[in-house]
Protein backbone atom coordinates (compact mmCIF):
# COMPACT_ATOMS: atom_id res chain seq x y z
CA UNK A 1 0.00 0.00 0.00
CA UNK A 2 1.39 3.38 -1.05
CA UNK A 3 0.65 6.23 1.37
CA UNK A 4 2.31 8.90 -0.76
CA UNK A 5 0.13 11.87 -1.70
CA UNK A 6 0.53 12.72 -5.37
CA UNK A 7 -0.47 16.21 -6.53
CA UNK A 8 -1.12 16.95 -10.18
CA UNK A 9 -3.12 19.39 -12.26
CA UNK A 10 -6.72 18.49 -13.09
CA UNK A 11 -7.22 16.36 -16.19
CA UNK A 12 -10.63 15.79 -17.75
CA UNK A 13 -10.71 12.17 -16.56
CA UNK A 14 -10.72 13.41 -12.95
CA UNK A 15 -13.38 16.11 -13.37
CA UNK A 16 -16.35 14.06 -12.15
CA UNK A 17 -14.38 12.71 -9.17
CA UNK A 18 -13.44 16.28 -8.21
CA UNK A 19 -17.07 17.41 -8.46
CA UNK A 20 -18.14 14.60 -6.12
CA UNK A 21 -15.23 15.33 -3.79
CA UNK A 22 -16.24 18.99 -3.49
CA UNK A 23 -19.76 18.04 -2.40
CA UNK A 24 -18.58 15.27 -0.05
CA UNK A 25 -16.03 17.61 1.51
CA UNK A 26 -18.24 20.68 1.93
CA UNK A 27 -21.45 18.82 2.87
CA UNK A 28 -20.44 18.96 6.54
CA UNK A 29 -21.24 22.70 6.43
CA UNK A 30 -24.73 22.35 4.94
CA UNK A 31 -26.45 23.05 8.27
CA UNK A 32 -24.91 26.54 8.34
CA UNK A 33 -26.95 27.47 5.25
CA UNK A 34 -30.63 27.86 4.49
CA UNK A 35 -31.81 25.14 2.07
CA UNK A 36 -31.87 27.62 -0.82
CA UNK A 37 -28.45 29.06 0.06
CA UNK A 38 -26.97 25.54 0.31
CA UNK A 39 -28.38 24.60 -3.08
CA UNK A 40 -26.89 27.74 -4.64
CA UNK A 41 -23.54 27.23 -2.88
CA UNK A 42 -23.27 23.54 -3.75
CA UNK A 43 -24.17 24.26 -7.39
CA UNK A 44 -21.52 27.00 -7.46
CA UNK A 45 -18.77 24.77 -6.06
CA UNK A 46 -19.64 21.87 -8.38
CA UNK A 47 -19.57 24.12 -11.45
CA UNK A 48 -16.37 25.83 -10.26
CA UNK A 49 -14.14 23.35 -12.05
CA UNK A 50 -15.48 24.68 -15.35
CA UNK A 51 -14.70 28.29 -14.40
CA UNK A 52 -12.56 29.82 -17.19
CA UNK A 53 -11.01 32.24 -14.66
CA UNK A 54 -9.31 29.51 -12.63
CA UNK A 55 -5.59 29.35 -13.31
CA UNK A 56 -4.84 25.88 -11.92
CA UNK A 57 -6.88 23.17 -10.24
CA UNK A 58 -4.65 20.90 -8.20
CA UNK A 59 -5.81 17.35 -7.51
CA UNK A 60 -4.39 15.17 -4.74
CA UNK A 61 -4.37 11.40 -5.10
CA UNK A 62 -3.76 8.85 -2.38
CA UNK A 63 -3.72 5.15 -3.19
CA UNK A 64 -4.85 6.01 -6.74
CA UNK A 65 -8.00 7.80 -5.50
CA UNK A 66 -8.83 11.50 -5.82
CA UNK A 67 -8.86 12.68 -2.19
CA UNK A 68 -8.25 16.42 -2.42
CA UNK A 69 -8.44 19.49 -4.59
CA UNK A 70 -7.58 23.18 -4.52
CA UNK A 71 -8.17 26.00 -7.00
CA UNK A 72 -5.63 28.74 -7.67
CA UNK A 73 -6.58 32.07 -9.27
CA UNK A 74 -4.33 34.91 -10.41
CA UNK A 75 -6.28 37.62 -8.55
CA UNK A 76 -9.27 38.42 -6.37
CA UNK A 77 -11.34 39.73 -9.25
CA UNK A 78 -10.86 36.48 -11.19
CA UNK A 79 -11.53 34.35 -8.11
CA UNK A 80 -14.69 36.01 -6.88
CA UNK A 81 -15.87 38.34 -9.66
CA UNK A 82 -16.37 41.05 -7.03
CA UNK A 83 -14.94 44.28 -8.50
CA UNK A 84 -14.52 45.89 -5.06
CA UNK A 85 -12.18 43.08 -4.01
CA UNK A 86 -8.96 44.58 -5.31
CA UNK A 87 -6.55 41.77 -4.43
CA UNK A 88 -3.99 41.72 -7.24
CA UNK A 89 -2.21 38.63 -5.92
CA UNK A 90 -3.00 34.93 -6.33
CA UNK A 91 -5.99 33.51 -4.45
CA UNK A 92 -6.56 29.97 -3.20
CA UNK A 93 -10.16 28.76 -3.29
CA UNK A 94 -12.14 25.63 -2.56
CA UNK A 95 -9.61 23.56 -0.66
CA UNK A 96 -11.36 20.22 -0.25
CA UNK A 97 -10.26 16.94 1.32
CA UNK A 98 -12.38 13.81 1.26
CA UNK A 99 -13.71 13.02 4.77
CA UNK A 100 -12.01 9.59 4.74
CA UNK A 101 -8.62 11.17 3.92
CA UNK A 102 -8.64 13.90 6.57
CA UNK A 103 -5.78 13.96 9.03
CA UNK A 104 -3.36 12.42 6.53
CA UNK A 105 -1.73 15.65 5.35
CA UNK A 106 -3.65 16.06 2.09
CA UNK A 107 -4.67 19.68 2.72
CA UNK A 108 -1.14 20.55 3.84
CA UNK A 109 0.39 19.05 0.68
CA UNK A 110 -2.13 20.80 -1.60
CA UNK A 111 -1.56 24.18 0.06
CA UNK A 112 2.22 23.81 -0.05
CA UNK A 113 2.05 22.97 -3.77
CA UNK A 114 0.03 26.13 -4.40
CA UNK A 115 2.42 28.21 -2.29
CA UNK A 116 5.46 26.85 -4.17
CA UNK A 117 3.78 27.54 -7.52
CA UNK A 118 3.06 31.14 -6.50
CA UNK A 119 6.63 31.61 -5.23
CA UNK A 120 7.96 30.30 -8.56
CA UNK A 121 5.88 32.96 -10.32
CA UNK A 122 7.70 35.61 -8.28
CA UNK A 123 4.63 36.72 -6.32
CA UNK A 124 5.09 38.26 -2.87
CA UNK A 125 1.87 37.03 -1.26
CA UNK A 126 -1.05 34.64 -1.60
CA UNK A 127 -4.57 35.02 -0.22
CA UNK A 128 -7.55 32.90 0.68
CA UNK A 129 -10.96 33.40 2.27
CA UNK A 130 -12.77 31.20 4.75
CA UNK A 131 -15.50 31.33 7.36
CA UNK A 132 -15.38 30.81 11.11
CA UNK A 133 -17.27 27.52 10.94
CA UNK A 134 -14.45 25.97 8.89
CA UNK A 135 -12.48 25.55 12.11
CA UNK A 136 -10.01 22.87 10.98
CA UNK A 137 -9.23 24.75 7.78
CA UNK A 138 -8.53 27.96 9.72
CA UNK A 139 -6.19 26.02 12.04
CA UNK A 140 -4.27 24.64 9.06
CA UNK A 141 -4.00 28.05 7.40
CA UNK A 142 -2.63 29.60 10.59
CA UNK A 143 -0.19 26.71 11.04
CA UNK A 144 1.16 27.43 7.54
CA UNK A 145 1.66 31.10 8.43
CA UNK A 146 -1.43 32.75 6.97
CA UNK A 147 -2.42 35.93 8.84
CA UNK A 148 -5.79 37.67 9.02
CA UNK A 149 -6.25 40.54 6.56
CA UNK A 150 -9.49 42.23 7.64
CA UNK A 151 -9.23 44.81 4.85
CA UNK A 152 -10.21 42.16 2.28
CA UNK A 153 -13.14 40.45 4.03
CA UNK A 154 -16.41 40.32 2.08
CA UNK A 155 -19.99 39.13 2.56
CA UNK A 156 -22.44 37.17 0.46
CA UNK A 157 -25.87 37.21 2.04
CA UNK A 158 -25.33 36.80 5.78
CA UNK A 159 -22.07 34.85 5.31
CA UNK A 160 -18.82 36.70 6.04
CA UNK A 161 -15.77 35.43 4.19
CA UNK A 162 -12.68 36.30 6.19
CA UNK A 163 -9.46 37.00 4.34
CA UNK A 164 -6.10 35.45 5.21
CA UNK A 165 -2.78 36.38 3.60
CA UNK A 166 0.58 34.64 3.50
CA UNK A 167 3.56 36.85 2.71
CA UNK A 168 6.13 34.87 0.74
Model-assigned labels for residue ranges:
Residues 12-94, 98-99, 111-113, 154, ...:
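Acetyl-CoA-dependent GNAT
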Residues 50, 119-120:
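Residue-level signal for alpha-helix termini/capping positions
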Residues 21-25, 86-88, 124-127, 131-144, ...:
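C-terminal "cap" of GNAT-fold acetyltransferases
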Residues 64, 68, 105-107, 145:
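Conserved phosphate-binding and hydrolysis motifs of nucleotide-dependent enzymes
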Residues 1-3:
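Basic/polar N-terminal segments that are highly enriched at the extreme N-terminus
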Residues 104, 121-124:
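Short coil/turn segments at alpha/beta junctions that flank glycine-rich nucleotide-binding fingerprints
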Residues 97, 103-116, 143:
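Conserved acetyl-CoA-binding loop-helix of GNAT-fold acetyltransferases
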